[in-house]
Curated annotation (Swiss-Prot):
InterPro entries: TCF25/Rqc1 (IPR006994). Component of the ribosome quality control complex (RQC), a ribosome-associated complex that mediates ubiquitination and extraction of incompletely synthesized nascent chains for proteasomal degradation. Within the RQC complex, RQC1 is essential for the recruitment of CDC48 to incompletely synthesized nascent polypeptides that are ubiquitinated by RKR1/LTN1. It is found in: Cytoplasm. Keywords: Cytoplasm, Phosphoprotein. Present with 339 molecules/cell in log phase SD medium. Residues 93-108 have a biased composition (Basic residues). It holds the Pfam family Tcf25. The modification Phosphoserine is found at S119, S160. This is Ribosome quality control complex subunit 1. The gene is RQC1. Residues 109-118 have a biased composition (Basic and acidic residues). GO terms for molecular function: molecular adaptor activity; protein-macromolecule adaptor activity. Belongs to the TCF25 family. Component of the ribosome quality control complex (RQC), composed of the E3 ubiquitin ligase RKR1/LTN1, RQC1 and RQC2, as well as CDC48 and its ubiquitin-binding cofactors. RQC forms a stable complex with 60S ribosomal subunits. It comes from Saccharomyces cerevisiae (strain ATCC 204508 / S288c) (Baker's yeast).
Length: 723
């Protein structure tokens, strides 16, 4: 080979070696970079997994730690051996599978635990009830047993704390028999008692309570209830009513709470009633609400206090008007009202005719309140309570349509004197509606309506709310309201206000929250106020020792006996737990023993003779019996209670079902002030209408007699022919 060929071969070998060395260097560099990338990727995934698995269980966390330790050990082995090992990273799918397995294990463990606890569900419910009871107890003890400092600032007697109740003698209470004008009650105290009355119209709707009782009830179901007819009507009548709705604007609306009021069709938003589809649309209401003037209030107070000086009464009226607004309901169209009232009077009093009365409210006067209430009572006695509720709601609608826009029932914003006839109809409609609500099971709504009824005249209390309000609040488990009210002057100013039922309701409320000492003190206070009734209750309901009740006979005390009968009619519904009845029996035995030892004193004037009560000319008593107790007893329609009413009450007084024991004039001047049904009847027109009805009846009797004679004659002829 030539030298040139040798040099070329050497250059080629050198080039080959250089290329080989470069390739090896690149391999080493790429291997290092790959290992670094793998290490970096592993760190990123571990960070992501730490964030994602932070909410997982501790078992999963331990598993991930073990994986990391195994990976670290593998890296150490690789470095020690010098031989690369393949690193396998956990993928997302594998981790999800691990999580699903862990969750399945956890669910299975939870299901097994639930099965084990299935037998202890009743115990858990009892513990939950105990927690609720403890919460109520702490809440009541925090707010319910505080004194009303505002009333004490007025220098007015208020009920003491339960611990001091035993030191308060009954004679510290005043009597309404000698104070018919409530002059000893500072009217400014009502400002601090507004919490005991109603200021939320939503609570007056039964649907509010239905939503609380059945949380899964749908708005569509409630809408269907609102769209239902309140009384049975034919499809033809419904079509006619729908045509009338198109002619009268603002009738019903989407929420069934709009009603036109006046010739301008101005819409009135209803507060506590809803328009039903079978109610006949009208352009304006039947009643209006009038604010009473100072002269009206003076006439009213002169009726209540016929023996007081007029100047003193005027001063009291001016003080009242600073805090309270007084109203009266009156007919918008007096002529139309007199016509409807005459038809009603003839169909109810002169010539009782149920069919004529039903026809009166069905076609001629569909919004005549006395007729609606009377027909509702007829349906109740016939057992048709479904139609009763619709008629009562229609009667309340008449008053709801007439209410002022800013009215609330807090005892200050709206009071209705009982001497006015249509005011009394509003009282009666609410009372009947409360009974209907209680029968339907909405006790909470019934208790709210009781607040409304009481707020219309909290001092006079014409229908005796103090005799039955405890019943609804106990059934509604509202113990805080009862305990707070027991410290209010509304229950403690006059002895007639601290009723037997409410006194025992305070005892029962303390028992329900396990305040035994307070319950004992409340029972001792009740015995000092009502010794005769509690002694009789001890014998009849608790089957106590008769020897302990000697010298405490209720015989001859009509008022105390009537109040006791009214309470005993509902005693089993309230005292329905054996431990509570046992407590009442044992504590009454102890109190009666202390009474006979002389350690307990009662008022020496208890059950005094009221023969001279008429000399005081009190409009709130009849022979010593509170007139509101009599009204409540009659309206309750409990046979055992009505049997305890003295017979002279029925014979010597006006007891109409639509107007029970209406107020009677106390002087010549008050004859024109006190309204009754005859106030809205024209005597001449009534005489003419009565004569026409008598002629019609005579004619019908003659027709019946002729028909009967003809029938007899035909039967005689047929018998002769057969013979």
């Amino acid at each position: 080979m030539s030298s040139r060929a040798l040099r070329r071969l050497q250059d080629d070998n050198a080039l080959l070696e250089s290329l080989l060395s470069n390739s090896n260097a690149n391999k080493m560099t790429s291997g290092k970079s790959t290992a670094g990338n793998i290490q970096k990727r592993e760190n990123i995934f571990s960070m992501m997994n730490n964030v994602r698995d932070s909410d997982n269980s501790t078992d999963e966390g331990q598993m991930s730690e073990q994986d990391e330790e195994a990976a670290a050990a593998g890296e150490r082995d690789t470095q020690s051996n010098g031989q690369p090992k393949r690193i396998t990273l956990a993928s997302k799918s594998s981790r999800r599978k691990k999580n699903k397995k862990a969750k399945r294990k956890q669910k299975n463990h939870t299901a097994e635990a639930a099965k084990d606890k299935g037998s202890d569900d009743d115990d858990d419910d009892e513990e939950f009830d105990k927690i609720i009871q403890q919460f109520k107890k702490t809440d009541i003890l925090k707010y319910g047993k505080t004194k009303n400092d505002d009333t004490n600032e007025e220098g007015f007697f208020t009920a003491s704390e339960p611990e001091e109740a035993s030191s308060q003698p009954w004679k510290s209470f005043l009597s309404l028999e000698s104070d018919p004008g409530f002059t000893k009650f500072p009217i400014s105290c009502l400002r601090h008692s507004c919490k005991f009355f109603q200021n939320d119209f939503k609570k007056l709707d039964p649907h509010t309570e239905f939503k609380l009782l059945f949380d899964d009830i749908s708005p569509e179901s409630l809408e269907d209830i609102d769209s239902m007819t309140s009384t049975p009507v034919s499809p033809q009548q419904l079509k006619q009513i729908q045509r009338l709705k198109r002619l009268i604007r603002n009738w019903g609306g989407k929420d069934h709470r709009l009603a036109p009021n006046g010739p301008g069709m101005h819409p009135q938003h209803l507060k506590f009633t809803k328009i039903r589809d079978d109610w006949i649309p009208t352009q304006r209401g039947e009643l209006s609400m009038k604010l009473l003037s100072s002269d009206d209030l003076l006439d009213w107070q002169l009726w209540e206090r016929p023996l007081d000086w007029k100047d003193v009464i005027q001063n009291d009226v001016s003080q009242w008007q600073k805090f309270i607004s007084f109203y009266k309901f009156e007919p918008l169209n007096s002529d139309l009202s007199k016509k409807s009232m005459m038809d009603f009077y003839l169909s109810v009093i002169v010539h009782p005719d149920h069919e004529a009365l039903i026809n009166l409210i069905s076609s001629k006067f569909p919004y005549h309140v006395p007729g609606l209430l009377q027909v509702a009572l007829i349906f109740i006695r016939q057992g048709d309570r479904s139609n009763t509720n619709g008629l009562l709601q229609r009667a309340l609608f008449v008053f709801d349509r007439a209410l002022k826009a800013n009215i609330i029932f807090d005892s200050l914003n709206c009071q209705l004197p009982y001497i006015y006839f249509f005011n009394r109809q509003f009282y009666l409609a609410i009372f009947r509606y409360i009974q209907s609500l209680a029968q339907r099971g909405v006790i909470g709504t019934a208790s709210e309506w009781t607040k409304v009824l009481w707020s219309l005249s909290p001092l006079e209390d014409p229908l005796g709310c103090r005799y039955f309000l405890d019943h609804y609040f106990l059934l509604n488990n509202d113990y805080q309201y009862i305990i707070e009210l027991s410290n209010s002057p509304l229950m403690n100013c006059y002895k007639q206000w601290n009723t037997l039922g409410f006194s025992l309701a305070v005892v029962l409320s303390f028992l329900r929250i396990n305040e035994m000492s307070s319950a004992r003190n409340a029972l001792l206070k009740a015995f000092k106020h009502h010794p005769l009734q509690l002694s009789e209750l001890f014998k009849e309901k608790l089957l106590g020792d008769h020897a302990l009740t000697k010298d405490l006979s209720i015989d001859g005390h009509s008022a105390e006996n009537l109040e006791l009968k009214a309470y005993m009619a509902r005693f089993p519904l309230l005292w329905n737990r054996n431990e509570e009845v046992t407590f009442l029996h044992d504590e009454m035995s102890s109190i009666l023993q202390d009474y006979h030892r002389g350690n307990v004193t009662i008022d020496s004037n208890d059950g005094q003779d009221h023969n001279n009560i008429n000399n005081l000319q009190s409009p709130f008593f009849i022979a010593g019996i509170p007139i509101n107790l009599l009204r409540f007893a009659i309206l309750s329609e409990e046979s055992s209670v009505m049997a305890a009413i003295p017979s002279f009450i029925w014979s010597d007084n006006e007891v109409y079902e639509f107007d029970v024991l209406p107020p009677m004039p106390t002087s010549k001047e008050s004859i024109e002030v006190v309204e009754n049904i005859k106030t809205f009847i024209n005597e001449k027109d009534l005489a003419v209408l009565q004569a026409e009805r008598m002629q019609d009846e005579d004619l019908l009797n003659q027709i019946r007699q002729i028909s009967l004679q003809q029938y007899i004659h035909e039967n005689e002829e047929s018998n002769e022919n057969e013979g």
